[in-house]
């Protein structure tokens, strides 16, 4: 179900009502219904929320990520508006998963993402469980030529290649995509070595998934080769889709997730990867998933997630912000 965002989600500190240099995001982000979205000459980005954690429930995880989109909006609200006057950010609302109808909600999200991309807007999806990604992918695939090569880059502790014979979940979507679309490749960074059975790593090799284990990313010497690999991967694809699962981070930095990672990545490492990918000219959309406010401590997962979203918006809009 599609709904508009409540105005109360965009509120915060006001330092000035006239000096643009003192504005914050809640003073500039415009709420616009999907029916009223039009293509613009302005360089623009659109935010869409996916209020759903049905995939997490099906995957036997801890629910609560459905509250992530509005929590992230609140985290973004008081961040400084540093974009150029000709740039715009709009909030087009939410897709809500009702009555456990995950597949229907994913199709609805895909329709929104496709429309936004076809209107030449950069797209940021606020999840939701990581089942958010499948709807994001559906929208990208519908917006570009059928034979265009999509390169998915996922920053995540998990491979998400579980079987979907019985039903899809937050752990199946990449297997769904790779088995259904011959024009997609999949590159995962941050995988937890102790988080998966040998069978799932074997499935990753069978599907020719590129992946980097978390403990191969612990030193600065390892990061530059990864940046080089990402650059080559992005250059080889027509469209790059970036998805971030917050459980990739060390649990001390991001406790508010369904499956926290004791050996997770440091925020600065994730930021470096995010900057690299969202600055590439083939990247036009980004999603952030698994922010669970009910499991958070002092709001630090939400705040970190909001900073990552801001970083993505800044780079997708051409790096005009701070």
Swiss-Prot record:
Top-level taxon in the UniProt lineage: Bacteria
Free-text remark on how the cofactor is bound = Binds 2 manganese ions per subunit.
**Signal sequence bounds:** none
Could you say which residues bind Mn(2+) 1 here? 130, 156, 160, 245
Annotated catalysed reactions: N-formimidoyl-L-glutamate + H2O = formamide + L-glutamate
InterPro entries named in the record = HutG (IPR005923), Ureohydrolase (IPR006035), Ureohydrolase_dom_sf (IPR023696)
Q: Which PROSITE patterns match?
A: ARGINASE_2 (PS51409)
Which of UniProt's keywords are assigned here? Histidine metabolism, Hydrolase, Manganese, Metal-binding
Top enzyme category:
hydrolase
Residues that, per the record, bind Mn(2+) 2: 156, 158, 245, 247
Please give the cofactor(s) recorded in the UniProt entry for this protein: Mn(2+)
What EC identifiers does the entry list?
3.5.3.8
GO: which molecular function terms? agmatinase activity; formimidoylglutamase activity; manganese ion binding
Q: In which pathway does it act?
A: Amino-acid degradation; L-histidine degradation into L-glutamate; L-glutamate from N-formimidoyl-L-glutamate (hydrolase route): step 1/1
**Biological-process GO terms, alphabetical:** L-histidine catabolic process to glutamate and formamide; L-histidine catabolic process to glutamate and formate; putrescine biosynthetic process from arginine, via agmatine
Please explain the role this protein plays, according to its UniProt record: Catalyzes the conversion of N-formimidoyl-L-glutamate to L-glutamate and formamide.
PANTHER family in UniProt: ARGINASE/AGMATINASE, FORMIMIDOYLGLUTAMASE
Name the family.
Belongs to the arginase family.
**The protein's name:** Formimidoylglutamase
């Amino acid at each position: 179900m599609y709904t508009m965002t409540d105005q109360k989600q965009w509120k915060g500190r006001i330092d000035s009502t006239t000096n643009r240099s003192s504005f914050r995001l809640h003073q500039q982000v415009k709420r616009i219904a999907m029916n009223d979205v039009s293509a613009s000459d302005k360089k623009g980005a659109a935010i869409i929320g996916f209020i759903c954690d049905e995939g997490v429930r099906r995957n036997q995880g801890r629910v609560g990520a459905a509250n992530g989109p509005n929590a992230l909006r609140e985290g973004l609200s008081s961040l400084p508006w540093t974009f150029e006057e000709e740039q715009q950010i709009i909030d087009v609302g939410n897709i809500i998963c009702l009555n456990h109808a995950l597949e229907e909600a994913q199709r609805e999200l895909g329709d929104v993402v496709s429309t936004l991309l076809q209107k030449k807007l950069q797209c940021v999806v606020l999840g939701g469980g990581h089942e958010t990604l499948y709807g994001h992918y559906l929208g990208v695939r519908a917006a570009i030529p059928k034979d265009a090569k999509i390169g998915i880059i996922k920053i995540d502790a998990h491979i998400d290649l579980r079987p979907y014979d019985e039903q899809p979940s937050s752990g199946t979507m990449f297997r769904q995509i790779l088995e259904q679309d011959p024009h997609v490749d999949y590159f995962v960074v941050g995988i937890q070595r102790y988080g998966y059975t040998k069978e799932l790593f074997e499935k990753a090799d069978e599907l020719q998934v590129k992946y980097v284990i978390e403990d191969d990313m612990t030193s600065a010497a390892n990061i530059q080769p990864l940046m080089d690999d990402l650059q080559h991967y992005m250059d080889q694809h027509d469209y790059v889709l970036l998805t971030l699962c917050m459980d990739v981070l060390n649990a001390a930095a991001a406790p508010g997730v369904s499956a926290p990672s004791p050996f997770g990545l440091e925020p600065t490492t994730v930021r470096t990867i995010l900057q690299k990918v969202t600055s590439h000219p083939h990247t036009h959309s980004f999603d952030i998933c698994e922010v669970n406010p009910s499991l958070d401590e002092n709001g630090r997962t939400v705040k970190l997630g909001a900073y990552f979203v801001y970083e993505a918006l800044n780079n997708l809009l051409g790096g005009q912000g701070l």
